[in-house]
């Protein structure tokens, strides 16, 4: 009898017995999530093997959700590796040695650092491989239709691709395993699976994802998509075009990267202007009648009137409850964690300084300095996103707040629920700006800066404009796709382009634009300056979310190692930890030499 393997978290057993309801709940955060009532109409305990498991669409859906249940266990490693190794997050005095070594870039194979362990990533990959084989068999045996197969194939393939990208970013060279295997330790057998370098891996991943038959979201009328217990699943699954955009960005195929990101930015375009606010606001970083996600003050010059709660203003990007309608304007890929179901939400333990928190990681002085260096439109001298991304701002023990705004240590200390936001509108806009800036079109960097600053309409309206005819301004249509934005707002006759509400990253943050210095006249010099602006704004906007190390590494690899090395040096040299300060210069030299990757240590 064949084994069921990773699909149901059994890696070496020939036959397993599982509590079916409990498994579904653990894998899907309470999969009453599925609208199919027959999903729960199953005997409480059921013995399964591969041949008996893949019988119908319900089985296929449970297998897909099992993949995501396993992937959710990677949240802690993902955030820690992508932030602690970079410049915006550092260990506290409460941190364990593994976190300190990551931050100090002193990880060695013999230490068995739990965060530098590739095995959890490969558990997800091998789960994907098993499910992909099972789905193919179901298709061949006519147990699911071709459309059902294509949708689930492409989704699981995208999860596997995303995991491989993370492995490549952190370990540099990794085994590329694309088939089901008996033992997870076979992964580390070079005669079976030779290692690919990061760029070789990316080429493989691009080719694989380009072969996928279905890049759209799941149709809304199938069992996988719905909601239960307050958790909406429409943003739960990986955005395949966003993933392809990331791969193209790494590969240096900037036009294709921009095309993929632009598709997300145009999520509501097919609805047409008749859809009203949804058409103008979804994924466009737009102002609206209530400025739901803007940095806002109740009183213009009263610093204490800053909107700082879970349902108003910029902080609500992270604090809004699941399924709240305006969240669809900004959330691209989000996973929700519930205290009643596995896996456990790890970020209360890592970041909170109360209740069940262990306060192991905190904002670095580097990011605090960056926020404090900004001046808002009302002349308040800090970036409000600093307060709105943290807790205990201005104290000796600031906390990373983006993951813990829904945690209440006083009333419900054991209720550790939260969300893992892997992609949102702002991160897509910033990556689009990075891709556009690398294109060779004349003046294209101005578009990138418009996305960063106050929006397209402001950037492409001449300073001396005073008329009513906006036909030839407030747009970038001359660039052609994927850089053709129409932000025109005219009244004679009335006209509203789909991007007329666009306000830019800094515009939404209530910050004035940062303009290109007059002494920068060369094209390449302008591109580097604009790229540095993108890097800085990414820090201010996306701090702690898991984007930092990939961005710095990507740009360092194509431009100059100092992009990464100088920023990590800045973090370490400003630390209150003497060991970190003492290591700063050595770490800079290490990163300048191209020594960027963790040891691929496999503990058997």
What are these regions (language model features)?
Residues 61-62, 69, 97-171, 192-203, ...:
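Conserved, well-structured interaction surfaces
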Residues 36-83, 572-604:
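Membrane-proximal, proline-rich intrinsically disordered regions
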Residues 36, 232, 343-346, 419, ...:
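Long, intrinsically disordered, low-complexity segments
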Residues 2-34:
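Sec-dependent bacterial lipoprotein signal peptides
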Residues 362-425, 468-470:
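Flexible, polar/acidic helix-loop-strand segments at domain edges
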Residues 37-39, 173-177, 202, 206-210, ...:
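Aromatic-residue-lined binding/catalytic grooves and analogous aromatic/hydrophobic interfacial grooves
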